[in-house]
Amino acid sequence: MSGHAGAVSDLVDQLSKLPGIGRKSAERLAFHLLRVHEDEALALASAIRRVRTDVRYCSVCYNLSETELCRICSDPKRDATRLCVVEQPRDLLSLDASGVYSGLYHVLLGRIAPLDGITPDQLTIDSLVERVRTGNFSEIIMATNPTVEGDGTSLYLSNLMQEFPVEITRLARGITSGSVLEYANREIIADALTGRQRL
């Protein structure tokens, strides 16, 4: 039971549902929003509404985009012979920020995790297979996170790709096992990309 006014209590409840935000942090954020100028609070509300209404998945790679094709898929300067497979759009951002890779991406929107009830049919694997079948790729880079589920997903995908005349590689192990790509720094990601190994 909260001692806050109804609107404040509702805001704290909603903020505490965000990843990494506990009740105390949610209270601090709520009270901060009460102190800021009204325009600032309304700008935040507008940005949240806009991201929910305007942002969608790219129709080709499943990156986040405000248009049908994301900025990467619509960039003619990208290397269309290499395809890097990642779990989430935030992984794509981390890899692309390294500046080492200039190819295309495919976002799975998750990883195979049977214990969590996540199966291959819940990911964008069918779309990936179709892209490889119809594309002109010479290399597929498995850039799933170095976790049990990420490694399992990479193995599953590499088995699916055996029928295609492409080289299948995996990021080098400069990224610690069990870690997440979005938290790795640019240098580690660059080393993992340049030192990738054949699967």
Swiss-Prot record:
Gene Ontology molecular-function annotations: DNA binding; zinc ion binding
Zinc finger residue ranges, C4-type: 58-73
Zinc found in the keyword field: yes
PROSITE patterns listed in its UniProt record: RECR, TOPRIM
NCBIfam families: recR (TIGR00615)
HAMAP family: RecR (MF_00017)
Protein name in UniProt: Recombination protein RecR
Native organism taxonomy: Bacteria, Pseudomonadati, Planctomycetota, Planctomycetia, Pirellulales
Gene behind this protein: recR
